[in-house]
Structure formats: C-alpha cells, structure tokens
Design a protein with these regions (language model features):
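Walker A/P-loop
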Residues: 39
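Conserved P-loop NTPase motor cores
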Residues: 29-36, 46, 116-214
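Residue-level signal for pocket-adjacent positions within structured domains
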Residues: 2, 13, 59, 138, ...
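Switch/coupling segment of Walker-type NTPase motor domains
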Residues: 16-20, 29, 43-121
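N-terminal pre-Walker A segment at the start of P-loop NTPase domains
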Residues: 1-17
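Pre-Walker A (P-loop) beta-loop-beta motif of ABC nucleotide-binding domains
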Residues: 24-25
Length: 214
C-alpha cells in the first residue's frame, strides 16, 4: 500500500503528494534562506509520516522537540557522554523508536561531535536492526561544513564522516537521509551531491544560487 504525504497545493489548486516509500528509497535535500519555510515543510513531512515510519531528527535549535507531545517521539538530551549516545542510538534502532536528538544550548563543536557519534552509532547497528528510518538533519551545513571552521579537526571529522555515511551509504542500512540547509554553499559538496531529490526554496545569495545550479 502506498502512502502519500500532502505537501501542499499547486497554483492550480492540485494537491502535491510525496510518496513515503519513494522517499525512504532515496535521499532528499531541502534548501532555502531563513524564513523561506524549510522548518514548516520539515514539520509537515514529519507529522504526516510519523504514523507510518520511524523517525530520527537531529535538532540543533530545539524546533522539533514538541513532536513528543503528539506523536510520542523520545527526546534525547544531546549533552551526554560518547558511551551514552552510542547506547541510546543502539536501543533506538533495536526497538524502532522515533526520536529527537536535541542539541539546543550546546556549543557548535559539541553539537557536531555528539551528532556525529549518534549518527555513526545508528549507521553501525547490527544488520538485524536495519529497519527503515527517516533521518532528518536540520541546519545540515553545521554538521557537514564545506570548509574547516573554528571547531577542532576531531569534531569536524566525526560529524562530516557521519553525514557522509548517512547520505552515501545509509540507504542500504535503512537510513533515509533528509538534510535541510539555508546555506547550500557552506554544505560539503560530497554530502549534497548524494541527494537524489531536491526541494528548493527562496534563495538570495549568488553563491548559493550558483551551487544550486550545479
């Protein structure tokens, strides 16, 4: 049975459906400047697909923790040790629980490091637990930066490696990547290039428009 998500309407008033089965078999990139509706679109996608598929959201700003109230997502405090994050990620895959990894309030280096550890543990789960999971990463340019920033090389390596695994090899392990960014030019090319579907919103900067054209 096919399940379609109603993503909105066209200028003619026709519904715009998104096939969940197709989404789980591919990778999606959502791009648009601040205020273009990315968070609204992601929220719509998550709320409408929640009854049908397990979800894991990497949430740097705390925008998605309220999914717990209506849909029962487990909210995970991102300020944990490496061993704790790995253990939780393993249980999430084993028990097929939808979750939100809340990184709000952590500095950027700790956000990158802990998100990377969590995603890598999801990726490294035993084969018997490779059930389909919709993995949504908001502000993806933070976790897969195109250039080195002010964070340690260790944090950048862990985070970028996890994002690369998700987008390049995750599908075979049941992980369907959905990444959202407001600065496409700041997102690592090898991560963005793996997306097979694109939803493009309002974009102002020439450098981002040039990347989108690529």
């Amino acid at each position: 049975m096919k399940v379609g998500i109603d993503m909105g309407t066209t200028s003619n008033g026709d519904n715009v459906p998104l096939d969940i089965e197709e989404l789980l078999a591919t990778r999606l990139l959502v791009q648009g400047n601040s205020g273009s509706g990315k968070s609204h679109l992601l929220r719509r996608l998550l709320e409408q697909s929640a009854p049908w598929v397990q979800q894991c959201i990497i949430d740097p700003e705390g925008d998605f923790v309220t999914l717990a109230d209506k849909f029962g997502h487990v909210v995970i405090d991102g300020e944990r040790t490496e061993a704790e994050l790995i253990g939780i990620a393993n249980r999430i895959r084993q028990h097929r629980v939808s979750c939100v990894l809340s990184l709000e309030g952590l500095d950027i280096e700790l956000q990158m490091r802990n998100a990377g550890i969590f995603l890598n543990a999801m990726f490294d789960a035993d084969r018997e637990f490779w059930y389909p999971v919709l993995v949504v990463v908001d502000e993806a340019q933070m976790f897969a930066p195109s250039v080195a920033g002010d964070v340690s090389e260790e944090a950048r390596k862990v985070s970028l490696g996890a994002m690369t695994n998700l987008m390049c090899r995750g599908r075979k392990r049941g992980l369907a990547g959905v990444i959202a960014t407001q600065r496409l030019a700041k997102l690592a090319k090898n991560v963005a290039a793996e997306a097979s579907n694109f939803l493009m919103g309002r974009t102002f900067l020439d450098i981002d428009m040039a990347r989108a054209a690529d």
